[in-house]
């Protein structure tokens, strides 16, 4: 950006202002302060889910994962994309538990079972109870959720936030 601005003889201070005030969009590595940090990310296709899992795995601390999977109109009713995402990436020693929640929690749990994660899976269909469970675990946590789960989950996280 700076190179282009410089080549066009534009004022570089404008870029500085933008960089200093830029904030990520909702559900893009958004952090909430529960008993421990909780990061939420939107997933809506295999590529997005794979990138989020790569980011999660870049953090070496012990952690919990929660996946909220819905199939409302805005999400798209076809959730077959979960079979194309590389959920085997969650088969890590430092991932202690994976909570499956949302309207299609059991579909997500089945998908994870096929990756050999059955000992780490806990299904909590109710989103409020799932977030409360994460908070009580007192461990860094990462939430991956589909579009319609994102707004509801963010609202729950705001209420739980310290």
Q: Where are the regions that the model predicts?
A:
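Glycine-rich phosphate-binding loop signature in dinucleotide/nucleotide-binding domains
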Residues: 8-11, 58-62, 134-141
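A short, well-structured juxtamembrane/interface segment
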Residues: 21, 26-28, 48-51, 127-131
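Generic C-terminus detector
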Residues: 106-162
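Gly/charged, well-structured mid-domain segments that form the phosphate/adenylate-handling core
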Residues: 4-43
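Buried hydrophobic packing segments
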Residues: 1-8, 49-52
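Active-site beta-alpha connecting loops in nucleotide-dependent enzymes
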Residues: 25, 36-37, 42-119, 123, ...
């Amino acid at each position: 950006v700076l190179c282009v601005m410089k080549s066009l003889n534009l004022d570089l201070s404008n870029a500085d202002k933008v960089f200093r005030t830029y904030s990520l969009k909702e559900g893009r590595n958004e952090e909430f302060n529960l008993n421990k940090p909780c990061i939420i990310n939107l997933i809506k296709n295999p590529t997005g889910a794979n990138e989020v899992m790569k980011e999660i795995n870049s953090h070496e601390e012990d952690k919990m994962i929660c996946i909220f999977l819905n199939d409302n109109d805005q999400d798209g009713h076809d959730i077959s994309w979960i079979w194309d995402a590389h959920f085997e990436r969650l088969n890590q020693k430092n991932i202690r538990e994976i909570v499956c929640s949302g309207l299609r929690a059991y579909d997500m749990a089945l998908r994870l079972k096929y990756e050999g994660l059955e000992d780490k899976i806990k299904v909590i269909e109710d989103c409020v109870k799932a977030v409360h469970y994460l908070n009580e675990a007192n461990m860094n946590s990462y939430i991956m959720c589909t579009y319609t789960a994102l707004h509801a989950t963010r609202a729950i996280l705001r209420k739980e936030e310290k």
